[in-house]
Swiss-Prot record:
Subunit text: Heterodimer of AddA and AddB/RexB.
Molecular function, one GO term: 3'-5' exonuclease activity
Pfam families hit by this protein: PDDEXK_1, UvrD-helicase, UvrD_C
Domain UvrD-like helicase C-terminal: 485-774
Name assigned to this protein: ATP-dependent helicase/nuclease subunit A
Needed cofactors: Mg(2+)
E.C. number: 3.1.-.-, 5.6.2.4
Biological processes, Gene Ontology terms: double-strand break repair via homologous recombination
Family: Belongs to the helicase family. AddA subfamily.
Keyword annotations from UniProtKB, A to Z: ATP-binding, DNA damage, DNA repair, DNA-binding, Exonuclease, Helicase, Hydrolase, Isomerase, Nuclease, Nucleotide-binding
Reaction(s) this enzyme catalyzes, per UniProt: Couples ATP hydrolysis with the unwinding of duplex DNA by translocating in the 3'-5' direction; ATP + H2O = ADP + phosphate + H(+)
Gene responsible for this protein: addA
Annotated NCBIfam families: addA_Gpos
Length: 1197
């Protein structure tokens, strides 16, 4: 029986209050959540369908449902009474509200559609479909605006459009529309934020913009005062420039006075700022030049802070800032009207097609629940409401939950230190506000319980995390103080390992190198250097041991124990993957980007671009060099050398005009093809045109023959599907399709290709830190720690913020100049702080993934200079100026006892400061890039040695008796004959379906089958119907992916199939072959009912087993002992207490009710499945079934 900690037990047992459970990383929050639910069911006798359990992903909801089902069955097995009540809970589990916010909203809207006049038959629009609708709505809106000729519109275009186009203004409308969807009442919020611009100087002083600016300036001025205090200390040291003290104290007094003036109206601060006057330093001849320079440097930095405020924040007066805002009011008002106009048109288009998007669902539900009768219905229904991952909520979701909660029935669990989804508009301040205001004692109506014990990581990892984050995370930066409440505490004991210290590898970019190496190093990208060093470390790790509690002993580290975490996978993941493959390390990169970078997609888009406009050099050269153009590099050079002016297409035309060689006629043929395709594009629908290009060029077949051909073909099919969806809109033509695709790219609409990986595959994982959240690994390598933060969010013409509203630049149309408004300046500061806080929490997530070992890797330039900077970075101002993760990590480590190597490198004389948290152990390695080059040179020398031996091999010596030790062996190998020629005809591997076909008695047919190289897509075959085999494949796929907890009706099944179509798992045509009535009948048949109630269900499970050839192939001689591999896929099996149940689905037509004939056809196949399952699981298959969809019947074999 599990032993709960005191805090966990309190979270499980507490009743009569709203609970916020602040659950640290690895603290067992999900287990606590499930146990609380079970105890509510058991002790409070509340049915599971009276609970609302909200998660943030469908996967999390499914896992939660499985965990609850497992916990209920465990309780039933105890036979302590109440089994009937628990059985009832299992039957209710299918309709229990364990759901995402969006799924809950769907339920609310479908139940109460009449209250808001929404078609109950709505479907959720595909992202591409809704993107096209947005584009259409925007184009129509702007066309109407140009026709109206309104002056304010043209002023808006001039202020926020591009130099020659209005695309930036269109993008701004879309950006504002998307942003305000995170508000409960978007249009009201936007209207109020526009009215903020019509303010007086008195209102300006009280505005949130000024409050934010004051907060920022307070941090800056405190930073300046800290620098001056350090300078004063240095000035008074022995040998220090003590004559500087007068000026330093004068500076300090003035800045302190300026700091205190922040408590007054901003006009007072502005006046005080302009009164500051820094006096000159006195001459100091006898002082230590190093101390003198250091002192002057610190003072200059403090002065620069004041200068920055004067020149970049208050370079104009408060009155001028107010005037700017007032003059912007008409533009902001018209911008509001554009956003509303776009919203109305977009909504109309969705209504016409009967679709909604996810934002609609939330706002529809809010409108319904604003009606107290509807809200009261849910208050009465749900005895308790649970919100998982509460730190990732936004204000819309918060408003939804608050509208249906009672006074004391809300349970929220999460960890604000792991709130890393601000880019999805998550709002961690919702968690923080409750964290700071909820009481910790029993009896509070709003109560907070902290789960601080970590059961994932060994103590050395936890100590390191605590040490780093105590030095960097605070209320000002990180949005929460990393104090005793936030720290991690070890929750379980670990067996010792050889080196538990946290390892940090600093790769110095500019370490002194030999001149010979310089050229090679310049060619070696920073990413590749890190990748190679990580690869080398991985190889070394394989010789180390960890303790594995599953085997109750030590074992060697395997590839699958290791994960490489990256802040961004773009460029980095692929580079690491390529290096690992070269080094013989099996690896898998889990990246969400790369679709548009895939060579086949990029090339085909370039072909479309060239057909649309041949005078684009890069796309044209790409197509010509590809298999479609089939030009060699030499031919391309000849064309350009002949004419070095103009576009490359001009050079082609000139070559055709002047030359008479074979290349000319090759070019003529190529141009004719392009012209023909350009003509076709004018008259053929874009999807049909892409189909035609696939056929004309044969490119689809070509990529199918490349490594990863099936994936490449799938990528091209996605492009065809995009064109098919585009064709359904009112926007037509090749140019507009290319424009649409490029808009998807620029709006980060890229998507990674689907990849499948089993958790037991022995490979190193490469993934983003975001993807790793919630996961754990024995060894974690965080790489790219020296990569600079991306803070470009503050560079846009108009910034947006949930609290500060709109932050536009001010443009003077007369002077044709622009400057930042006070609103934009405030938002720049606030967004930077929030972005850095998020980066800090991302680092926390990365550092809390390892169970046994954490290895940190990062590249750094001018390490001595950086170390000195780190040694002085001990306040919020310094941490806010960090450029990357290493700046934060280094700031803490330079003060740690194990940081002596860093202190020596930076020429620092101080000892480590003791702060009670130096229990952490660190190994700090400083590496040079030349290590990699030396290894490469060593490899080259070995290869040259082998080549030299081959070069001087003497054939005459070999013939005349030399090399006798090799000659006999070579002759034996060349003259060798295989002793069992019959075995050559036996295949090494067969599928179960091959075996089934007439029990296989044609050995030669088996041995000489050559599979088709590539598979044509349905759209290229011109099919309008599906074969029986294809229908079966679709039905199997649907059965594999259906959520078994949502199959209560045909409508439930149809909705899930619509979801599969929307996400392009199956096509619209494929979905039509699925008979939902048949599927429903299966789930409610006797065997289907047993399957749905099972504790664990496994679907589409592949297997490979070894069999004697004689057992499988008829007609073989008895003395043949050859083995072969039999592979297959088991449709479904599930666990019951006393064994496994195996089900195989069949869509065969049962003629004249002759079920026995169908069963006979599959007896051998099912016996192989049964044998495979028993051998793989080690458990008995107690029952085997064929489910025949034709007669809606399960038949036991």
């Amino acid at each position: 029986m599990r032993q709960w900690t005191k805090e966990q037990q309190a979270a499980i047992d507490a009743r009569g209050s709203n609970l916020l459970v602040a659950a640290a990383a690895g603290s067992g929050k999900t287990a606590v959540l499930v146990e609380r639910i079970i105890q509510i069911i058991l002790k409070d006798r509340i049915d599971i369908d009276r609970l609302l359990i909200v998660t943030f992903t469908n996967a999390a909801a499914g896992e939660m449902r499985e965990r609850i089902a497992g916990a209920i069955m465990t309780e039933m097995e105890k036979k302590t009474g109440g089994e009937e009540h628990l059985r009832r809970q299992l039957s209710l589990l299918n309709r229990a509200s364990i759901t995402t916010v969006h799924s809950f909203c769907i339920d609310v809207v479908r139940r109460h559609f009449h209250m808001i006049d929404v078609d109950p038959g709505f479907r959720i629009g595909d992202v591409t479909e809704t993107s096209i609708m947005k584009l259409e709505a925007l184009e129509e809106l702007f066309e109407d605006e140009y026709e109206k000729g309104n002056e304010e519109f043209f002023n808006l275009v001039e202020a926020f459009g591009g130099t020659r186009e209005d695309r930036p203004l269109q993008d701004l409308v879309l950006k504002i529309y998307g942003f305000i969807q995170s508000q409960p009442y978007p249009e009201i919020w936007l209207r109020e934020r526009v009215e903020d611009f019509a303010l007086s100087i008195e209102a300006f002083n009280q505005s949130p913009w000024i409050r934010t600016i004051k907060k920022r300036m307070g941090i800056l001025l405190k930073g300046a005062m800290d620098l001056l205090e350090i300078a004063q200390t240095i000035a008074l040291e022995p040998g220090g420039p003590d004559v500087y003290e007068e000026a330093i104290l004068s500076d300090l007094d003035q800045i302190k006075e300026l700091y205190h003036s922040l408590e007054n109206p901003i006009t007072d601060f502005y006046e005080q700022l302009n009164c500051i006057n820094f006096i000159r330093l006195k001459t100091s001849k006898d002082s230590d030049p190093i101390l003198k320079e250091e002192c002057k440097d610190l003072r200059d930095k403090a002065k620069d802070i004041v200068k920055d405020i004067r020149e970049n924040i208050f370079n104009v007066s408060p009155e001028e800032y107010v005037e700017d805002l007032n003059r912007l009011y008409p533009l902001m008002d018209y911008l509001y009207r554009l956003v509303i106009g776009f919203t109305e048109r977009y909504t109309e288009k969705k209504t016409d097609k009967g679709i909604v998007d996810f934002n609609d669902l939330e706002h529809f539900a809010l409108r319904i629940l604003a009606n107290d009768l509807a809200a009261q219905e849910y208050r009465e229904k749900f005895e308790y409401i649970f919100v998982d991952e509460y730190q990732d909520s936004n204000i819309v979701q918060e408003t939804l939950i608050q509208s249906i909660k009672r006074e004391d029935n809300l349970f929220m669990v999460g960890d604000v230190k792991q709130s890393i989804y601000r880019f999805r508009l998550a709002d961690p301040t919702l968690f923080i506000e409750k964290y700071e205001t909820f009481g910790t004692e029993e009896g509070h109506i709003n109560r907070r319980i902290d789960l601080a014990k970590n059961f994932r990581s060994r103590g050395q990892v936890l100590n390191g995390v605590n040490y780093i984050f105590k030095h960097m995370m605070s209320k000002e930066l990180g949005e929460i103080d990393y104090d005793e409440r936030a720290a991690l505490y070890q929750g379980t004991e670990f067996e010792p390992i050889q080196d538990p210290s946290i390892e940090i590898n600093l790769i110095e970019k500019n370490m002194e190198i030999d001149e010979e190496m310089e050229e090679e190093l310049q060619e070696l990208a920073d990413i590749e250097v890190e990748a190679r060093i990580v690869a080398k470390r991985i190889k070394a790790l394989l010789n180390e041991e960890i303790y594995d509690p599953r085997v109750e002993g030590y074992r060697k580290i395997e590839y699958k124990d290791i994960v490489v975490l990256l802040r961004t996978t773009q460029n980095w993941a692929q580079s690491f993957l390529e290096v690992f493959v070269r080094e013989g390390i099996p690896a898998y990169a889990d990246a969400n980007t790369g679709y548009f970078e895939a060579i086949e997609v990029n090339m085909f888009l370039n072909l479309l671009r060239v057909i649309d406009n041949k005078r684009q050099d890069i796309p044209l050269l790409s197509v010509m060099r590809s298999p479609i153009g089939d030009f060699t590099t030499e031919e391309l050079i000849h064309i350009r050398v002949n004419d070095k002016t103009g576009t490359y297409y001009d050079a082609i035309e000139k070559y055709v005009e002047e030359k008479t060689d074979d290349l000319k006629y090759k070019l003529v043929s190529f141009i004719e093809k392009l012209n023909q395709w350009a003509n076709d594009a004018r008259y053929i629908k874009i999807d049909q045109f892409i189909w035609k290009l696939f056929m004309d060029t044969g490119y689809y077949y070509y990529v199918g023959a490349m490594p990863g051909g099936l994936q490449r073909q799938a990528n091209l099919r996605v492009l065809f599907d995009r064109a098919n969806q585009f064709e359904k809109t009112s926007i037509k033509g090749l140019f507009n399709f290319i424009k649409f695709i490029e808009k998807l790219q620029s709006s980060k609409g890229d998507m990674g290709a689907a990849k499948i990986l089993g958790e037991n595959d022995n490979v190193v994982r490469i993934m983003s830190i975001h993807k790793s959240k919630g996961l754990e690994f024995p060894v974690v390598i965080t790489a790219g720690m020296g990569k600079n933060f991306n803070l470009r969010d503050t560079s846009a013409d108009v910034l947006l913020h949930k609290d500060l509203g709109l932050g536009p630049k001010f443009t003077d149309p007369n002077l044709r100049t622009y400057r930042d408004t006070i609103a934009k300046l405030a938002m720049k500061d606030q967004i930077k702080i929030e972005s850095l806080s998020e980066e800090m929490r991302i680092l926390y997530v990365a550092f809390t993934r390892p169970k046994d070992k954490l290895i940190v890797v990062g590249s750094i330039r001018n390490i001595e200079k950086q170390v000195k900077k780190w040694s002085k970075a001990d306040n919020v101002y310094s941490l806010m100026n960090a450029k990357n993760y290493l700046d934060w990590i280094g700031t803490a480590l330079v003060k740690h006892p194990d940081g002596q190597a860093l202190r020596e490198l930076g020429g620092l004389g101080f000892d480590a400061a003791s702060d009670g948290m130096e229990d952490s152990e660190w190994t700090i390695n400083i590496l040079g890039r030349q290590v990699i080059v030396l290894e490469e040179q060593d490899k080259v020398l070995k290869e040259e040695d082998y080549r030299e031996k081959l070069l001087y091999f003497n054939r005459e010596d070999f013939s005349s008796g030399g090399y006798t030790e090799y000659k006999e062996e070579i002759e034996n190998r060349l003259n060798w004959k295989y002793d069992h020629p019959h075995s050559v005809q036996i295949p090494s591997k067969l599928s179960v379906s091959d075996i089934k076909k007439a029990h296989i008695n044609e050995i030669d047919v088996i041995a000489h089958q050559i599979p088709i190289l590539v598979k044509s897509p349905k759209f290229m075959e011109g099919k309008t119907t599906f074969t029986a085999a294809e229908r079966g494949t679709v039905i199997h796929f649907v059965l594999q992916h259906l959520d078994l907890n949502k199959v209560g009706s045909e409508e439930d099944i149809r909705e899930q199939i619509h979801w599969m179509v929307a996400r392009e798992l199956i096509t619209e045509e494929e979905s039509k072959v699925v008979d939902t009535k048949k599927i429903l009948n299966y789930f409610y048949s006797p065997i289907g009912e047993r399957m749905r109630k099972a504790k664990k269900v496994y679907r589409e499970s592949p297997f490979i087993i070894e069999k004697s050839a004689g057992e499988v192939i008829e007609g073989l001689s008895d003395d043949i002992e050859d083995k072969l591999l039999v592979q297959g896929i088991i449709d479904c099996y599930f666990e019951e207490k006393d064994g496994l149940i195996l089900i195989d689905y069949k869509n065969d037509i049962v003629l004249n009710g002759n079920i026995a004939a169908v069963v006979a056809r599959y007896e051998l196949q099912l016996s192989l499945y049964r044998e495979a399952l028993e051998r793989i699981t080690g458990r008995e298959v107690k029952e085997t079934y064929l489910y025949l969809f034709d007669v809606d019947q399960g038949v036991r074999l």
